[in-house]
Amino acid sequence: LDTWSYVQQFGKDKLRGVVTIDMSPLPLSPDPKWWTEGTIEELSQVATQVLTSSQGCREFFSEYATGVMIQHKMKPDELEYLLDISGRTPYWICRQLFCDAVFSNYLEIAKDVGATLPSLMFIAEHWQGIAKPFVEAQLPGYDTYVMGGHLMFYEYPEKWNRVLEDFLDKL
């Protein structure tokens, strides 16, 4: 989302290519065929009932880290490391960042980017069944690469960097 936000704010003039990681340009949609972050009800619950305290944020990130972000079974110290990093952001800012992401709509910008710049979308394996067809249909200019969980660059740095370097070498 940050890449598309940058393009919205500053344009594409200084860009030679775009890489995005495992996020739909339209994270919230009532259409079940679209790649979203969850149902409207699920996302509403997270925003209004979960991310309302430090403890709620910690529990959310713990569940998200073990279920979505990382594929391997983490040891307690690795999970604690990730929770410590996320816990440095106050819960009210986490909530605002979550809502800002969920309610964003960069679909038209993402389409334009894919049509005019070399573009690579990394997709987490757990999303590939819906995300890959979504990107192929809605963002046909994007190359896609499926690997890992949401934190694929953390969990598989050599493989991720190799794919990134191959993309950058073509620019």
Language model segments and positions:
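Flexible "cap/lid" loop of the alpha/beta hydrolase fold
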Residues: 4-53
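Catalytic active-site module of serine/aspartate enzymes centered on a nucleophile-bearing elbow/loop
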Residues: 140-171
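A structural preference for long, well-packed, hydrophobic secondary-structure segments
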Residues: 1-8, 13, 26-27, 59-73, ...
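Alpha-helical elements of Rossmann-like donor-binding domains used by nucleotide-donor carbohydrate transfer enzymes
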Residues: 2-5, 63, 81, 96-100, ...
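Nucleotide-sugar donor-binding loop of glycosyltransferases
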Residues: 22, 125, 156
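Conserved serine/cysteine hydrolase catalytic core
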Residues: 87-147, 153
